[in-house]
A protein has these predicted regions:
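Active-site beta-strand termini and strand-to-loop segments that position acidic
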Residues: 10-14, 76, 114
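C-lobe/activation-segment region of protein kinase-like
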Residues: 84-108, 112-151
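Protein kinase-like catalytic core scaffold
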Residues: 16, 72, 120-122
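Conserved structural core of kinase catalytic domains
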Residues: 22, 36-91
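ATP-binding glycine-rich loop module of kinase domains
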Residues: 2-47
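Short, surface-exposed beta-strand-loop junctions and turns on beta-sheet-rich folds
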Residues: 24-27, 80, 127-129
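Short, exposed beta-strand/loop patches in secreted or surface proteins that constitute
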Residues: 7-10, 62-65, 111
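N-terminal non-globular leader segments, chiefly Sec-dependent signal peptides
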Residues: 30-41, 57-61, 139-151
Length: 151
């Protein structure tokens, strides 16, 4: 499976895939994204907070580990049933609040229904960071002074 910023490579283990990030050859542009180590860090953080103890019963984030310059390992998920964010808006609002407390602005992610009924949140390449003045800055440098959450 290939996207604009990288591709997913199946491994011999059916529960593990490799997320390979396209190498950046030009300066940051509107489509620039975080590199593999930062994507893995964001995904690992999100995986650690999307727990039953934190109030999540449907939303979860697949594990990510072993970041390298242009790739990292990730738990396999099914991507054949996209989910509209409105279907799990309560848990997404909780996720946004926890992310904001860490200085993270979630955006441009994807949601997929899993065979067990849970919803996997993936795609951390365009997450922005909150700045002290209440604006957010994206990986390609754009700053929004009044960011709006989709919920």
């Amino acid at each position: 499976m290939q996207g604009a910023c990288g591709k997913i490579i199946l491994t011999a283990d059916p529960g593990i895939v490799i997320k390979k990030i396209h190498r950046r050859r030009r300066p940051h542009t509107r489509t620039s994204s975080h590199r593999a180590p930062e994507q893995c860090r964001l995904q690992s953080w999100a995986h650690s907070i999307c727990t039953k103890e934190n109030g999540f019963s449907t939303l979860y984030v697949p594990r990510a580990w072993d970041p390298q310059a242009h790739q990292y390992n990730m738990e396999f998920i099914h991507t054949d049933k996209p989910v509209d964010h409105k279907e799990i808006s309560v848990e997404l609002q909780l996720f946004y609040n926890l992310a904001k407390a860490e200085g993270i602005f979630p955006c441009d992610y994807e949601l997929y229904r899993q065979p067990n009924g849970s919803v996997a949140l993936i795609d951390f390449d365009k997450f922005a960071i909150w700045r002290e003045d209440g604006s957010v800055q994206f990986p390609w440098g754009l700053v929004l002074s009044d960011p709006q959450l989709p919920i």
